[in-house]
């Protein structure tokens, strides 16, 4: 018992130390930097200021933030529309086939997402495989311009983040109470009524979790908007990257990062509140 207790203490101390060293302290440094002044010589001057946060109210940066939220929302809804039928199909397959498809769903994670975006860029370019194929079929007369548009950014975000939507949806659909669905049909409910009144409420925790897993990173994937959207389709992540790497305005970049973190934190809070209400509703439906 003593050895087990000592081992547990070592594990707890290790985890806490790791969180403090790699999460708490870096975030504390970013928060501190956001209240300092830019200096051309040393990047940061130890002079307190609130100007970095005031600059975020500038219409230019505020518009980028709203644009990021809009793009993330569209990408999330697109992933939900594409991911739900796939997750449903996956959950209804024989158990012998499911592991293979789940494995194929995870395989893309073995390749760096940046490399995959480069591949997608080649595929969708004016002289890419998609346009060449459509021209060969005679569907189009001239190549379609897809790259460097908002649609290209959405396609890139969906391409990268779709598995994050499918996984929680699959988990929720797989746990559906089959006798409950059969009872609804026996009582005369149509397939659409069963789907809207039974299936959607029961899988809502997976829907909310999937939307959160997609929407949060979608706002910060700056390389997707860089490669697929160009300079006219910036996300808030691009602003942070430019401030740190190009302009070297670390305090303003830190302030932008903290603002994005606060927005994500509010989304997590909404998710926590919604998940509690949904779990209660699901238990009521099951009862």
Swiss-Prot record:
Pfam families: BPD_transp_1
Organism: Salmonella typhimurium (strain LT2 / SGSC1412 / ATCC 700720)
TM spans (from-to): 11-31, 71-91, 100-120, 146-166, 198-218, 252-272
UniProt cross-references to InterPro entries, sorted A to Z: MetI-like (IPR000515), MetI-like_sf (IPR035906)
The protein's name in its UniProt record: Spermidine/putrescine transport system permease protein PotB
Keywords from the named record: Cell inner membrane, Cell membrane, Membrane, Transmembrane, Transmembrane helix, Transport
Main location: membrane
An annotated GO BP: transmembrane transport
Chain's gene name: potB
Keyword Iron: no
Membrane-protein topology: Multi-pass membrane protein
Subcellular location(s) per record: Cell inner membrane
Cystines in this chain: none
Presence of keyword S-adenosyl-L-methionine: no
Family assignment from sequence similarity: Belongs to the binding-protein-dependent transport system permease family. CysTW subfamily.
SUPFAM superfamilies given in the database record: MetI-like
Occurrences of domain ABC transmembrane type-1 (ranges): 65-271
GO cellular component annotations of the record: plasma membrane
Membrane topology (Periplasmic): 32-70, 121-145, 219-251
